[in-house]
Regions:
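A short glycine-rich, Lys/Arg-flanked "PGG" loop and its adjoining helix->strand segment in the class I
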Residues: 142-154
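A short SAM/SAH-binding and catalytic strip from SAM-dependent methyltransferases
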Residues: 126-142
Length: 233
């Protein structure tokens, strides 16, 4: 049954607000390799650094930055970073981390992606970056592309690091003699996928259950809306 998008976003926010400290300094910190990251390990994949190219002195906006470890990894590469996330708890953790590693020119803003242009007062950036596992928490991919088009400078770059939605669509299914992967849901579904789950992806044993809602976007939809909205970049 279709869910109300605003109610879905509120439930997601409640979950992310609760889990931010768990991921940053609680039982989920091992999953995030916080200790290693604080010691200098980058959260960026080698191909991200290679494909984005030199960022020294460039302005970089990280949408849906969560606790800021990816954002601050870009700071370590020399970018002037702005991180944006709708979870106040996550932004507090990001600001705490910036202080811990001595990055004083990064800023973090509490805002939904749809409100980013207003929240950032129309500022434009050399690079707009979105990391893996972020788009599925947005209810409108066309709106995302439109917002990005207003945030990227002429001649700038939108960089999206994302995995195929097929990964989330598959789950193991028991069959005689073992198990096989089957589809959890229809990849052509355009409604939210809602579920109640225990723990966190960073700590499956974390107590309590949370209801979450996500929207899966096929590559063709993402590429099409990005191309239509960002034709001159």
């Amino acid at each position: 049954m279709p869910v109300d998008k605003e109610e879905a976003i509120k439930e997601n926010l409640d979950s992310w607000d609760e889990l931010a400290s768990v991921h940053a300094q609680g039982s989920g910190a091992e999953f995030y390799r916080i200790e290693q990251w604080l010691a200098g390990e980058s959260k960026l994949a080698p191909w991200e650094i290679e494909e984005v190219g030199p960022v020294v002195g460039k302005s970089l906006l990280h949408l849906q930055c969560h606790i800021g470890t990816d954002s601050l990894s870009w700071s370590r590469e020399g970018a002037k970073v702005t991180g944006l996330d709708y979870s106040p708890s996550a932004i507090r953790e990001a600001e705490r981390f910036a202080g811990m590693i001595g990055v004083d020119d990064a800023r973090f803003v509490v805002s939904r992606v749809r409100d980013a242009v207003e929240s950032l007062e129309g500022e434009e950036f050399d690079i707009v970056y979105t990391g893996r596992g972020a788009l599925c928490w947005l209810p409108d991919i066309e709106q995302w592309a439109s917002v990005c088009s207003s945030l990227v400078k002429q001649g700038g770059m939108l960089y999206l690091e994302e995995s195929t939605p097929m990964i989330n669509a598959l789950e193991p299914m028991a069959v005689e003699g073992g198990s096989v992967f089957g589809l959890r849901y229809d990849l052509f579904n355009t409604e939210a996928v809602s579920e109640v789950s225990e723990g966190s992806y960073a700590d499956p044993d974390y107590p309590g259950s949370r209801r979450s809602h996500c929207w899966e976007y096929r590559y063709d939809s993402t590429v099409s809306y990005t191309h239509l909205t960002l034709p001159t970049i």
